[in-house]
């Protein structure tokens, strides 16, 4: 049996995508430096959690997977 170190990142999100990505980046790197090989970050970490109601004002937060800059960034980090 192989051992796998897992980390679950807990972070406070703000309404600033760049700041949230930078925080997640720092915490992922910290977890990896501590030996984690599987690192989980919060869903919808790019911004404030907005899924309490289905409000049209939040629909523009959705972005396609293809070419998504955050997905590309964390894929390269992996």
Residue ranges, per PLM feature:
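A broad, low-specificity signal for short, low-complexity segments enriched in glycine/proline
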Residues: 1-3, 47-48
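Active-site-proximal beta-strand elements of phosphoester/diester hydrolases
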Residues: 3-15
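Cys-nucleophile CN-hydrolase/nitrilase-fold catalytic domain and related Cys-dependent amidase chemistry
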Residues: 17, 26-78
């Amino acid at each position: 049996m192989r051992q796998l170190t897992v980390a679950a990142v807990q972070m406070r999100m703000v309404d600033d995508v760049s700041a949230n990505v930078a925080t997640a980046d720092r915490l992922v790197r910290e977890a990896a430096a501590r030996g984690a090989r599987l690192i989980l970050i919060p869903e919808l970490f790019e911004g404030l959690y907005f899924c309490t109601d289905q409000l049209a004002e939040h629909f523009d937060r959705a972005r396609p997977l293809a070419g998504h800059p955050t997905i590309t960034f964390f894929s390269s980090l992996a």
